[in-house]
């Protein structure tokens, strides 16, 4: 379960709250959507979920783990984000997907990390692209690689 409970956020101690008592519950398999006018706090809420911004009060939890107190590595194992425009540089498709495993290994990937990546490549039918540079791919193919990287976080 993903739960936001009474989340409050403001940019400065003297400024008004951008988020004031936001609450939400999503059961496994449910999909949520954020809609709102400009300046409504969608990006601020999203940044709080990702751990980029720290709320003044309230909690964000996933499977009972308080994400507002979780380490970056713990959050990466529970929350994945696929931006609309992602930069890959000159990485190969395989290496780019492997980056999704960073929270699981230190300096080097283990055999288990390689198996996860290879299974995702097979599952998403990316075998023919695996050795190519992401910079050579179309926009849609890049988006697919970004999703594969998020899946590698498990």
Annotate the PLM regions.
Residues 112-129:
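Conserved ABC ATPase "signature" region
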Residues 66-80, 107-113:
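ABC ATPase NBD coupling module
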